[in-house]
Curated annotation (Swiss-Prot):
Annotated positions binding a ubiquinone: 202
Protein name: Cytochrome b
Family: Belongs to the cytochrome b family.
Swiss-Prot/TrEMBL cofactor(s): heme b
């Protein structure tokens, strides 16, 4: 057998075709780095999570103490815990950039890749939610109580489902144990789905910043884009290590340094920053079921993006009206994130309702209408 081993070996050839000799568009920008950064974040989370799980105890009377024990007594336990907690924030930051790039450059036209990506987003959000409950601090306990209690809004069977999820009549030991089991299991499902995500991506080939077919302008992934990805890794490590070593609790809620107490409700219950946009949409509707539907719709709307694409151009690169709307959507997303961290009082209630309407109106009305207008002006 002649030729390099990486091309002839049954296992190495798969890796070679995915990471080394993969034909890639020659004009990919930095916005295509976030997929590999997400893979890196997932690996960091699985490794640090594995070592944390060795010392963690999923019992309501011991969970908070076990996290304290990890930080105080385990060799570099403080570092593991801080890396795990802060990489979650970087994970979601990269995830939102990745989705934003997909919307801006029209990557959603590859339906299978996009749909699996949205499923990955939902699974990652679920994993982060159950993980946030594990330290069993005040915000962990009350966050779990409030968010799981939303299921009771489902007509007729809601209350039964909530008790089934809790494993009892309140958030207690059974809830913590099963949440730990889910938090351990889901990252491996995410890893498996990520491979399928890549498989579908490599069936169609990557999109590029122009949104124009690039079959005749390809370049090998290695060394050009692998070097570019490693540059992204170095920048991520620098930012992550700066936060982990200089200000590890910058993104944490101070309330979570108090052990869970079912008798004392925190003044302001809120999730981590990466869920605040959806939380703001939930709170903006003065009806429990309506709020839950809006909360789910704020994420599930991504499934509809390919069907709402009416433009003759794939990317927004040559579509100024759609570009303006995209940056308006980004602004609305940031405003919703800020509103989610504010108390439920005027003027934040009204601002939340306006921003929520704007969020959905951009997806369902503004983008399709702007695309139709651009079609008439350009073609």
């Amino acid at each position: 057998m002649t030729g390099p081993l990486r091309k002839n070996h049954p296992l190495f050839s798969i890796i070679n075709n995915s990471l080394i000799d993969l034909p890639s568009p020659s004009n990919l920008s930095i916005w295509w780095n976030f997929g590999s950064l997400l893979g890196l974040c997932l690996i960091i989370q699985i490794l640090t999570g594995l070592f944390l799980a060795m010392h963690y105890t999923s019992d309501v009377s011991l969970a908070f103490s076990s996290v304290s024990h990890i930080c105080r007594d385990v060799n570099y336990g403080w570092l593991l815990r801080n890396i795990h907690a802060n990489t979650a924030s970087f994970f979601f930051l990269c995830l939102y950039f990745h989705i934003g790039r997909g919307i801006y450059y029209g990557s959603y036209v590859n339906n299978e890749t996009w749909n699996i990506g949205v499923i990955l987003l939902l699974l990652t959000m679920l994993t982060a939610f159950v993980g946030y409950v594990l330290p069993w601090g005040q915000m962990s306990f009350w966050g779990a109580t409030v968010i799981t209690n939303l299921i009771s809004a489902v007509p007729y069977i809601g209350s039964s489902i909530v008790q089934w999820v809790w494993g009892g009549f309140s958030v207690d030991n059974a809830t913590l144990t099963r949440f730990f089991a889910f938090h351990f299991l889901f990252p491996f499902i995410i890893a498996a789905l990520s491979i399928i995500h890549l498989f579908f991506l490599h069936q169609t080939g990557s999109n590029n910043p122009t949104g124009i077919e690039s079959k005749f302008d390809k370049t090998p992934f290695h060394t050009y884009f692998s070097t570019k990805d490693i540059t992204g890794f170095i920048i991520l490590f620098m930012l992550l290590s700066s936060i982990v070593l200089l200000s590890p609790n910058l993104l944490n809620d101070p309330e979570n340094f108090n052990p869970a107490n079912p008798l004392v409700t925190p003044i302001h219950i809120q999730p981590e920053w990466y869920f605040l946009f959806a939380y703001a949409i939930l709170r903006s509707i003065p009806n429990k079921l309506g709020g839950v539907v809006a909360l789910l719709a704020s994420i599930l709307v991504l499934f509809l993006v390919p069907f709402l694409h009416t433009s003759n151009n794939q990317a927004n690169t040559f579509r100024p009206a759609s570009q303006s709307l995209f940056w308006l959507l980004t602004s609305v997303f940031i405003i919703l994130t800020w509103l989610g961290s504010q108390p439920v009082e005027d003027p934040f209630i009204l601002l939340g309702q306006i921003s929520s309407i704007a969020y959905f109106a951009l997806f369902f009305l503004a983008f399709p209408l702007a695309s139709e207008l651009e079609n008439k002006l350009i073609f």
